[in-house]
Amino acid sequence: MSMLCYTLIIAFLIGIWAAPKSEDNVPLGSPATSDLSDTSCAQTHEGLKTSRNTDQRHPAPKKAEDQELGSVANIIVDPKLFQKRRFQSPRVLFSIQPPPLSRDEQSVEFLDNEDTLNRNIRTKRETHPVYNRGEHSVCDSVSVWVTNKTKATDIKGNMVTVMVDINLNNEVYKQYFFETKCRNPNPVPSGCRGTDSRHWNSYCTTTQTFVRALTMEGNQASWRFIRIDTACVCVIIRKTDNF
């Protein structure tokens, strides 16, 4: 009797051991796991493909500013445009490095040894420093590099597109403009500093000058005279009650 019980127990254990395992308990690397992985990867790839096709059919709208900058960015130009010295302006700089933000913070110097533009004018500025000997300016001005100028008025009064980036000899150069403007139209309550307020009304205003800059004309780059801020001057008006 005991032998029969042992035989049945052994047969039961052998049956359990020989039963197929579920997919949840299949060890990693078995055929069942590989099938699941392949199925999951296929579904993921299909989802990514569908998402990519949807993005291509419905591209994200770009900002107007980005579209405008993209139209004048990284344009390939002919190196011959830079061979004539008459096209060079002391307030226009082409460089692959950002210039200093202000001459008040650090000296404005030539920023790229490979570029031969604007070297002499900046050297002359630094060889004649201005010392504080009690002199005061009639108007307070601030000079900064303008790095994102895309529109300007040309010498004919038309609004033109200014190139931001250019591709010259496989190097991307950015066009910078050194502009000067008034810090405050009334540095003192009476207007300009040092004027006779009893007989004159005065105020400070920014004036502009034409410089040659690289602009877009159709689909080609060309030099044009454009207006930029270059100085801060004092305007005086005689008071009418003195007549």
Swiss-Prot record:
UniProt note on tissues of expression: Expressed by the venom gland.
Key words of the record: Cleavage on pair of basic residues, Disulfide bond, Glycoprotein, Growth factor, Lipid-binding, Metalloenzyme inhibitor, Metalloprotease inhibitor, Protease inhibitor, Secreted, Signal, Toxin
UniProt xrefs under Gene3D superfamilies: Cystine-knot cytokines (2.10.90.10)
GO CC term (a single one): dendrite
Pfam families: NGF
Top-level division of the source organism's lineage: Eukaryota
Propeptide segments, given as residue ranges: 19-125
Disulfide bonds: 139-204, 182-232, 192-234
Keyword Glycoprotein (UniProt): yes
SUPFAM superfamilies in the record: Cystine-knot cytokines
BP terms from Gene Ontology: cell surface receptor protein tyrosine kinase signaling pathway; modulation of chemical synaptic transmission; negative regulation of neuron apoptotic process; nerve development; nerve growth factor signaling pathway; neuron projection morphogenesis
Ranges of biased composition (kind: Basic and acidic residues): 47-66
Signal peptide (UniProt feature, chain positions): 1-18
InterPro entries hit by this protein: Cystine-knot_cytokine, Nerve_growth_factor-like, Nerve_growth_factor-rel, Nerve_growth_factor_bsu, Nerve_growth_factor_CS, Venom_nerve_growth_factor
Principal location: secreted
GO molecular function: growth factor activity; lipid binding; metalloendopeptidase inhibitor activity; nerve growth factor receptor binding; toxin activity
Glycosylation sites: 148
Region (Disordered): 47-67
Localization, UniProt: Secreted
Assembly: Homodimer; non-covalently linked.
Family under the similarity heading: Belongs to the NGF-beta family.
PANTHER family: BETA-NERVE GROWTH FACTOR, NERVE GROWTH FACTOR NGF -RELATED
Biological role: Nerve growth factor is important for the development and maintenance of the sympathetic and sensory nervous systems. It stimulates division and differentiation of sympathetic and embryonic sensory neurons as well as basal forebrain cholinergic neurons in the brain. Its relevance in the snake venom is not clear. However, it has been shown to inhibit metalloproteinase-dependent proteolysis of platelet glycoprotein Ib alpha, suggesting a metalloproteinase inhibition to prevent metalloprotease autodigestion and/or protection against prey proteases.
Protein name: Venom nerve growth factor 5
